[in-house]
Each structure stands twice: as C-alpha cells, then as structure tokens.
Amino acid sequence: SYLLYAALHYGARARAYYVNSAFQPAFELEDARRLAGELNADMKVLPVDVLASETVTANPPDRCYHCKQMIFRTILAAAEADGFTVLLDGTNASDDAGDRPGMRALRELSVRSPLRECGLTKRDVRMLSRDAGLFTWDKPAYACLATRIPTGQPITARDLAVTEAAERDLFSLGFTDFRVRMVGRSAKIQLPAAQMPRLLEHRQEILQRLGPDYDGVWLDLEGRG
C-alpha cells in the first residue's frame, strides 16, 4: 500500500497488479480496490488458478516458492505487455529472507523490494502510511489462507472456503488478529490472550457457526502474539 502511494506521490509511472486466487479472502480484493480508488491509482486484477498446480496443492514445505513463481510470472507477463520493465513488491526489512521460500522466487525473477532495500521495517511502513493518511496503516498482517492448512495436508477448494468463512464469522463478532487453523478436520482458533474471555462469552454462537464445517472447534490456550 505505502509503496504504491510513494510511487504515485513522486510521479512515477506505475500500475498496481492484484492477483486474485483461492488463497486470498474476498476482503483483500475489496481493500485493494478501495486503496486504488483513494489514490486514483491504475490497478489491474489478474486471476490465477493456484489450485491447478499439483505441486502447490500438495502443500510441501516450499509451497510458497512454487505459488510465488506462479503469481509473479503472471504479473511479469502482464506488466511486460503493459510496457513496464521493472516489477516491485512490498516486502519490508522485517521480513526474514532466510526463513521464507517465497523470497527465493522473488530473487530468481528479479523482483525488486524497495522497502526492504531501504531498510524500512514493518513499523516504519506503518508510521509512514499513517502520516500519508492511508487506511491500511493499522491493518493487521494477514497471511494467505493456505497457511492455515498444515504442511503436507493437501489443499482443497473446500478447505479454503471453510477457513475463509470461519475467519469471516469471527471477524463479524469483533475479533481481530486471529487465525483459524485446520488440524485434521477440526478448527484451532488462535487469538490474543486478551480476547479469550470474549471468545468464551460467544462460545455457543461460534460453535453454531463453525460446527457444521468442522469435526471439532478448539481454542489454542497459548494465544497469539
């Protein structure tokens, strides 16, 4: 978000690309469209069928690498067709390159990460975004839906849809910064310890909403964050 703002603020010829796949919840596309509208930015939505890749759906430890390859090759092709020669992404200095297979895909495809290259951390980006008046400045970090499914467990369209619905239900009840992870056919809810009392207050409603899609609903007492 901030990278797009900065590019436009300093007069760069830029176009935003949003990859729409089964791994992204609907609200992410809504937020991207809102941001593009507020910045008067040109944004192109590119559909990518990540579930068509057996390597990705097998969910190996380096799934993110293969998925990033699919995503960024699609963006690169679109950008080249649009007359662009440089592709930038929003990775920042807080992202651990040594622990992310997806980073390898970025390097191999020559995708540049200006925020990271300039040493801007996640906190720096939030503060700069706040100063710029971007609504995304305090938006909780959100990893793709595939991260909710244990490594080695095949990823299916049904599991992704169930996960998205479960997290949407919890969000509608006022919970924030949480994850609903699959453990077998059960749901494990991870959220900050401070929100646990509220979750127990809504216990019956949560069971009614999530129960039909899962064999069980668990609360991770270790909390999140």
Where are these regions (language model features)?
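ATP-dependent adenylation/nucleotidyltransferase module used to activate substrates
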Residues: S1-D131, S172, A187, E205-Y214, ...
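Catalytic cores of large soluble enzymes that bind and process phosphate-bearing ligands
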Residues: R63, C67, I155-R158, V162
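Short, structured loop/turn "capping" segments at alpha-beta junctions
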Residues: T121-K122, R126-M127, L134-A143, T176-F178
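Internal, active-site/partner-interface "lid" segment
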Residues: K139-D159
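Short amphipathic alpha-helix segments
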Residues: A157-F178, Q204
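C-terminal boundary motif of the adenylate-forming
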Residues: G174-V183, D220-R224
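Short, aliphatic-rich beta-strand segments
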Residues: V180-A193
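Short, conserved charged micro-motifs
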Residues: Q195-H202
